[in-house]
Regions:
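Short, solvent-exposed cationic patches
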Residues: 37, 106, 148
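Extreme N-terminal, non-catalytic leader segments
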Residues: 62-69, 73-123, 184
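Long, basic/Gly/Ser/Thr-rich N-terminal segments
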Residues: 1-88, 280-288
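Generic structural signal for well-ordered secondary structure
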Residues: 56, 93-94, 248
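Post-Walker A alpha-helix
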Residues: 138-139
Length: 288
């Protein structure tokens, strides 16, 4: 069977599934392997009963895609895929690059955040926040102001010789229809990837940075009804913006809340000590 090599989130990935959106890599010893196979027997009943996810702490995890395809991630180094009878390949590859690789990194004890990563020319900045907070809107505006593109939606952070680094993911940005139209990109030049969520993909080789960057700032975006803001809106017709620097326990709580699968791990297994150490290093290095 054909084997493909890619550089994804800074890791050499060997895969039996092609990823047209990823950066090709020379063949060599892989840090992550993606291949076809059967699910472990212990998970057969879960799939038959209609369950969608299962985790075994930070050791292994399983999830089922809406087309019936199943994915098993173990040891921070292997992803096994069992295709359904009618696989939706664009959805499968998208989830392998997000959820699949997120589980790999968390199992490796590395922080993996929800958010976008951009490059200022000197350092990486992360844009985090809940769905609807404006991450994509702010990221698109900054990209139009000539910042570099590192990652869209999910970001791997890990220790480097000079400090904590944000790794590039792959040169593709996901857009909803409204955002694509707002930035003036013709829809026919984009790739339609998700009918249910009306999502498009934009290949961003034009501004993609292939090397990791030292993490500088993390911005948590949110929409709040804060006392005094309503008056500003009524008086000026514009929304007021407030910024606050977080330190200490609040900074750590904020970082942990932005981890991929944060709620699952906070309320079941808890965040393991090695991963918490990485969060402490990030809080000490980056302004939040």
């Amino acid at each position: 069977m054909m084997e493909y090599f890619y550089r994804i989130y800074g890791l050499r990935v060997q895969s039996q599934i092609p990823f047209s959106e990823a950066v090709p890599e020379t063949a060599g010893e892989a840090e992550v392997k993606i291949g076809f196979g059967r699910m472990p027997d212990v998970l057969l009943e879960a799939g038959q009963k209609g369950y969608g996810t299962w985790t075994n702490g930070f050791v292994s995890a399983w999830f089922r895609i809406r087309d019936g395809t199943q994915v098993y991630v173990e040891g921070g180094s292997r992803i096994t895929v069992e295709l359904s009878e009618e696989p939706q390949l664009l959805v499968i590859t998208s989830l392998l690059l997000s959820a699949g690789m997120a589980l790999v990194c968390l199992q490796r004890g590395e922080p993996f955040f929800h958010g976008s990563a951009l490059y200022t020319g000197e350092q990486a900045i992360l844009l985090c926040g809940e769905s609807g907070a404006g991450k994509s809107t702010v990221a698109m505006e900054l990209l139009q102001r000539k910042l570099g593109f590192l990652a869209d939606d999910t970001v791997r952070v890990h220790p480097g010789t000079m400090g904590m680094l944000a790794e590039p993911s792959y040169p593709q940005q996901k857009l909803c229809r409204d955002m694509a139209l707002k930035c003036g990109k013709p829809l026919e030049e984009l790739i339609y990837i998700d009918e249910e969520r009306d999502k498009y993909a934009w290949r961003r080789q034009d501004c993609y940075r292939k090397e990791a960057a030292l993490l500088g700032k993390i911005f948590l975006l949110r929409k709040d009804a804060v006392a005094g803001w309503q008056d500003a809106v009524q008086n000026t017709g514009e929304e007021a913006v407030s910024i606050q620097k977080l330190t200490g326990q609040k900074a750590l709580e904020t970082l942990s809340s932005q981890l991929y699968l944060a709620d699952t791990y906070r309320y079941s297994t808890g965040i393991p000590y090695p991963l918490m150490k990485q969060l402490v290093r990030i809080a000490g290095q980056a302004g939040i």
